[in-house]
Amino acid sequence: MNKILIVFCALCTFQFSIMAQSFRTTSAIYNVKNFGAKGNGTVMDTKSINKAITAAATEGGGTVYFPAGNYLSGSIRLKSNITLCLDAGATLIAAPGENADEYDVPENKIDNMYEDFGHRHWHNSLIWGENLHDISIIGSGMIWGKGLERSNKGEDDKRPNKSISLYLCRNVIIRDISMLHAGWFGILATGVDNLTIDNVKMDTNRDGMDIDCCQNVRVSNCSINSPNDDGICLKSSYGLGFARATENVTITNCQVSGFEEGSFLDGTYKRNDSRRPTGRIKMGTESNGGFKNIAISNCVFEYCSGLALETVDGAQLEDVTINNITMRDIVNAPIFLRLGARMRGPEGTPVGMLRRVIISNIVAYNVDGKAGAIISGIPGNDIEDISLHDINIYFKGGGTKEQASIEVPGLENGYPEPGRFGVTPAYGFFVRHVDGISFDNIHLGLMSNDDRPSFVLDSVKNASFRFVNTPVRQGLENLYLKNTENVKIFQSFGSEDTTVKKVSFVKM
């Protein structure tokens, strides 16, 4: 027995030795300071960093290592089989405007105008890569986009505006880093497949991460604070020059918020109640290619906008599950589903579809009282097959009887944003142009009096309410039905079970 154990241990030791030797051979370390980087925050280190990357790539790949220090840099050009490792205490700083020549200029990759400037250019970034494979950005250090712009004024504006920008890449890992003031986009991934973003902490003032036309994506354990734009945003633009779906995506164990920029990472969590922070998880607005097979779970929203699923440029948004979400201090609609016809894309593209979505196990507290949750298609194009169950939402209230008669604008061709619809006639859910929606085990609460109904259904077919609990308010109805067909009510609203076959208008 002892001889067998000795032989087994010897084999294990030999195998480990071979694996370790292989790791050393294929994962050499290239310290940027050995290539001339100073890391003192005053001398430009762009050339030294890119020299280290080129040296590693020439040898087949490796890890480009940043020890503790402040590295002032312009555009860093990634290559295949390269890992950038920012060690604890290392800060990579985007050089300010007077060092504009340190950045690569925006390339003219596509000539359509179906998307914003930022979605048509990738090279004008702090870190960028194109047509690469097997790349990583890891470590406990920080990327500070000090010199990055939060927007660009037009096609002739050459200023850098992104922290990390990847185009048509595969097998990508971004892990453990912190990011501050990350530009127009903290992470812009366009046409990137097999992408993992894990344990990233970002405190910025525009989009945190935009995942555009990507497939097989895992976002996990991330904290994104973005008061003036979206935190985690899935898109499917025309940025590749053709439509491509964003699909097979999981977003799990993440936190999004809208505190003042910089106050998330420093732990002060400052609020500015003079504006409505964004900072949410969203699909859209760019929606040419579609969104398919998406799972969002175990996420926290705090002091920000609510969940938004939007397709307005002809794409199909389908087969989506959203589960185990908590929200607190939400400044507009806690749930926003929008099928529209903005149609920023090739002429002749038909209106898209929004269907087969399940939203469950949601708790939202202190939700803005002006607009309830909004689920809205457009005439001739219904949202289909929506299931909402096990949801508790507590609204601030404050609505009036007069507001219960508000006609909500259609905005069929407009930009999809909850605030543009104004005050809704329901404090809870406003549902319009939907075929197939179920509400099961829903609890709505009011933090102050509200004289609007809990639900308004307009031009809706095949709706069901089961175990829906709303506040008892003397002399006020809970449900308005307008131009509605086949509505089933079971043990809900404290009323008798009933089925409404077809009605032009009724209050219940």
Regions found by a protein language model. Give the residues of each.
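Sec-dependent N-terminal signal peptides
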Residues: I4-F14
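Extracellular/periplasmic carbohydrate-active domains that bind, remodel
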Residues: C12, S17-M508
